[in-house]
Regions:
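Binuclear metal-dependent phosphoesterase catalytic core
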Residues: 2-9, 13-16, 113, 195-208, ...
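Active-site-proximal beta-strand elements of phosphoester/diester hydrolases
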Residues: 16-26, 116-128, 169-173, 229-235
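Active-site-proximal segments of metal-dependent phosphoesterases and phosphodiesterases across multiple
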Residues: 67, 134-140, 163-206
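N-terminal active-site segment of His-dependent metallophosphoesterases
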Residues: 1-77, 87-90, 142, 146, ...
Length: 251
């Protein structure tokens, strides 16, 4: 069930964990405490915060440090993944280190359990969907491209295999389904996600919900082939299409 953070907080479902999710923060060097108040408010509404990549604008150290300062306002566990913007300056490991020291549990082939709910994820990669998914055929460059998508998907699978929970949340940056890309130009669908991740999600019955970002002009809600709910929580989608600052779900 999706809950607007603007209304009064309902009682959580029995044994449920309230998860807030948001992606595409795009923190820049000139920003000053851009999310401190929001993180403090999320801490009052949710039990866990999931960040779905593009946490910084260009993957610069000062940007990560600004976000790290704001994360100190979070009084709840924070899990998340990096996005393509966090790789732009060629130092994603440094961005990850800064955010890890600020308390972010990075999902990059790892898995975490919080109050009985499992969390797994990865950045993900591109490649397309269905019959139009790119295959490893032809030039070496194409094969390298596809291999990058395969390796990212293996990180997700590795994390999921670590979990034995009946309730699992998947967090990625790129989309695992085509549904949540509706609204984007069809020509760029292959560059917004990969069906490989959706197929992996469907192999693990414990997965109850998945969050991603990246598709700023996409749709809010979709499903995998097995029916697992998938939500595009990129900030522009939440603000424009749903009228909320963060998604909030009982899992």
């Amino acid at each position: 069930m999706s809950l607007s953070p603007e209304g009064p907080r309902p009682a959580p479902s029995a044994g449920g964990l309230r998860v807030a999710a948001i992606g595409d923060l795009h923190v820049g060097e000139t920003h000053r405490r851009p999310y401190r108040e929001l993180f403090a408010r999320i801490s009052q509404e949710a039990d866990v915060l999931a960040l779905c990549g593009d946490l910084t604008n260009f993957g610069k150290t000062p940007e990560a440090e600004i976000l790290a300062e704001d994360l100190q306002a979070c009084a709840i566990p924070v899990v998340g993944v990096l996005g393509n913007h966090d790789y732009e300056c060629g130092q994603p490991q440094e961005v990850a280190r800064i955010l890890h020291e600020a308390g972010l549990k990075l999902l990059d082939g790892e898995a975490f359990e919080i109050e009985g709910v499992g969390f797994a994820g990865c950045k993900g990669f591109i490649g397309g969907f269905g019959r139009h998914m790119l295959s490893a055929f032809g030039e070496p460059e194409i094969k390298q491209f596809v291999q990058a998508a395969v390796e990212e998907n293996l990180k997700l699978e590795t994390g999921l295999r670590m979990l034995r929970n009946e309730r699992i949340v998947v967090v990625t940056h790129y989309s695992p389904v085509l549904d949540t890309l509706q609204g984007e130009p069809p020509e760029i669908y292959p560059f917004l996600g990969s069906a490989r991740m959706g197929e992996t999600i469907d192999r693990f019955e414990g997965v109850k919900i998945a969050f991603h970002g990246h598709a700023h002009r996409g749709a809010y809600e979709g499903r995998t082939s097995r029916g697992v709910p998938v939500y595009n929580v990129a900030r522009p989608v939440l603000n424009r299409d749903v009228g909320i600052e963060f998604a909030l779900f009982d899992v």
